[in-house]
Amino acid sequence: MGVTDIIKDFDKLKGQKLVYGSQGKTSLDAVPILAFDMLGLPVNVVYGMKGRKAGRAAILRGETTIDYQTTASYLKHVKPLVEKGEMVAVMTWGAPSGGEVSRDPNFPDLPAFPEVYEAVTGNKFKGTEAKSWTALFYAGFATQKYVMLPKSAKKDVVKAWQNAAAAIVNDPAAMKVLNKKLGKYDQVTGSKALKSALKKATSIDSKSEKFLQSWKDTK
């Protein structure tokens, strides 16, 4: 494609035949699909992928031309290809920071989606579309992999699990392994922090919800 910088080469990217292999519009893929629309990229979304592994295989076979992978998958499977010059990483979805979506700390040299949006559209990352995308982002990426217990679990059992999670987060040896495999992100532990994160991941304003319902029906 000849695209190495999504902002500088954006017009070149828009002129390409872009095909994305998706798991479904109500899956995590709602995040990239809406992002493509917001950027005005002419992406042909092909449904039927069984997972991002299948999506990765499709782009490696040349069946698709644009893809995304989670940090863990990228570090293990895609980064070596980037280093060989066989793939190009152009942006991340970002990471929560101070109430905003900023650059992912694991990829500080890559712009986050909100940054790309503002640069190529000339608009601030605000309004219903931006709020809708951010709600999807928090639900799909920023807060995930919760450890859940039955509501009937006794307090001492809940406390034991909370203490175990905190012990892992505070164990440098354990975190070294996790950070290497999954990427270095802040881990959420403790009842208060978890409730706050869960609320953000499961809440959406009515205007954004209405927009997403309508948008989904067009895909």
Specify the residue positions occupied by each region the protein language model found.
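Sec/Tat-exported extracytoplasmic proteins
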Residues: 39, 63, 71, 82, ...
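Ligand-binding pocket segment of bilobal, Venus flytrap-like solute-binding proteins
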Residues: 16-118
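Extracellular/periplasmic bilobal clamshell ligand-binding domains
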Residues: 172, 189-219
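Mature extracytoplasmic/periplasmic domains
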Residues: 94-104, 113, 166, 174-198
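C-terminal lobe and pocket-closing loops
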Residues: 6, 77-169, 210, 215-219
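Hinge/capping helix and adjacent helix->loop/strand transition within the periplasmic-binding protein
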Residues: 1-61, 122-131, 140-177
